[in-house]
Every structure is written in C-alpha cells, then in structure tokens.
Amino acid sequence: MGKLTLLLLALLVWLQYSLWFGKNGLHDYGRVNDDVTAQQATNAKLKARNDQLFAEIDDLNGGQEAIEERARNELSMTKPDETFYRLVPDASKRNQGSAQNNR
C-alpha cells in the first residue's frame, strides 16, 4: 500500500506542477492578462477617435456652417466681397521668445 500512496503522491505533485507552472499556467495567465489590459486601452482610444469622427460626419451632414468653416480653414476660401488678412508674427519678437525659452 505504501508504493501506491507514493505513486499517487508523485502523480499529484506532477499534476500540480504542470497546472501552476506548465503551459497555460500562472506565467501565461499573467502575460495574457497584461495583453488584455493593453488591448482594452487601445480599444478605448480607438472608440474615442471613432466617436469624434462620427460627430464630425453628423456635423458635416447636418449643416452648412461646418462645411463653410472647413473650406475657410483648409482651403483658405473667402466669401464674395470679403478680404482675407493673414497676420504673421514679427520675426524679431519670435526670435526673442525662443531666446528666452532657451535660458
């Protein structure tokens, strides 16, 4: 009876070792858990971006104001009898500002 008990105990130890430290054990569980967390963070960023794009699409479909704003900003379009002024910062002030930032 002692040999059978020893054999069963050895089998139990081997099964427990393979369960905890073998394939699909604790190490794999931790790695997969980290992968899931990283994927959830990526999914959250992509969902926020999708929501923003859907809102922009709805805005473009719904009104002329968004289309006009986009045409003015991206294509520099103006209305008839409208004058476009571009304000360029003074180069000397720009150089002074960068010199102060470098200190």
Swiss-Prot record:
Highest taxon in the source lineage: Bacteria
Membrane topology field: Single-pass type II membrane protein
GO cellular component term of the entry, any: cell septum
Ranges in coiled-coil conformation: 33-62
NCBIfam families: PRK00888.1 (NF002058)
Family: Belongs to the FtsB family.
Subunit structure comment from the entry: Part of a complex composed of FtsB, FtsL and FtsQ.
HAMAP family linked: FtsB
Protein name: Cell division protein FtsB
